[in-house]
Regions:
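N-terminal presequence-like segments and the immediate start of the first folded domain
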Residues: 1-58, 62-75, 81-133
């Protein structure tokens, strides 16, 4: 059986226990991060879209950090958008403050009808640095 390790950032255990999943799973040198949203500490969505995207990236950063990774270790990104035509420019503005220069990861953006009250979600796959394994 493949050895896996659950990664849950500090202060977020109740959220993941309530819904029965892990923030991320480490399998060998890969980290599979569950969809991160712009949730406030109480789990509710940030109302302002740009702030929601910023908070989703912050939550993603906390999950990566808990596993010993950074944004530079990300190799694949999937983002979900409830209104991509009107949201993509703001999302790209935030994204470009985090992913500033090549090489950029692979990226797929998907338009969806529903995200449980959220308007943006991001999931990634990262390769753990060799000193984190």
């Amino acid at each position: 059986m493949t050895q896996i390790k659950a990664i849950i950032p500090a202060g977020r255990h109740a959220l993941y226990e309530k819904h029965g999943y892990s923030a991320a799973i480490q399998s060998k040198d890969l980290l599979f991060v569950s969809g991160q949203v712009g949730s406030l500490q109480n789990g509710s969505p940030e109302i302002d879209y740009e702030k929601q995207v910023e908070l989703a990236f912050e939550n993603l950063g906390n999950t990566l950090e808990a596993a010993g990774c950074t944004f530079e270790d990300i190799i694949d990104v999937t983002t979900f958008h409830t209104d991509p035509e009107n949201q993509l420019d703001l999302m790209m503005k935030v994204k470009n403050t985090i992913f500033k220069e090549p090489p950029y990861s692979a990226w797929t953006a998907v338009g969806v009808n529903w995200l449980a009250g959220f308007d943006f979600e991001i999931k990634v796959i990262a390769r753990l640095p060799s000193d984190s394994n």
